[in-house]
Amino acid sequence: MTSELIPFHALPIYKESTDFVLTDEEKSVIVNGEFRKALSKQGNAISKSAEVLDDEKLVRLKTHILTVFNDYVTNHLQIENQFYLTQSWTAINHKGDAHHSHIHPNTVFSCVYYVQANSGDLQIKMPVSRIQEGYNLSYNVVQQNIFNSRTINISVRSGVIVIFPGWCEHQALPNEDDAPRIILGTNYFLTGTFGDYDNKDEITIR
């Protein structure tokens, strides 16, 4: 297992590569559900269900994803606030298909587990690079990096988990492999009390 915290745009983007693979029974639950085609022409098929991980046959997968996410919150973000799982869904890209650029509304963090992936990076995009914020200068870039680029491509393979802020615009680049690219996505929101009564900023989210 290897992990990497990617500070693109000073954001806590996390990638963990593992050898965690699904059993045939678990994978059949993922791929045999009902799917709908996205409105874009890129052919991305998304599960109709937004509670895929509620299936009892996927308890092992759910435990794995939540363990990685909770470790991310505790050991990388280093905050004590509580998050809860709001949605879980699957998406499939066949050869030549991609996942259109989008964000996840009503979400603090999003997580993608790659059930099967041999091709197609996850791309995260910002309106401008970090050093363009404020003045939006057109710099003469010698070599792109996390400071002077408005996009970052994260290479993915089967078993990889990527966590990022849900408001970040992102897309999956085309799958050039003969085998379908299969992902399971999850979203998270906060619960609990934040702020302080005396500071007049206390709020409770249930």
Placement of each model-derived feature along the sequence:
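A short alpha/beta connector and helix-capping loop motif
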Residues: 178-188
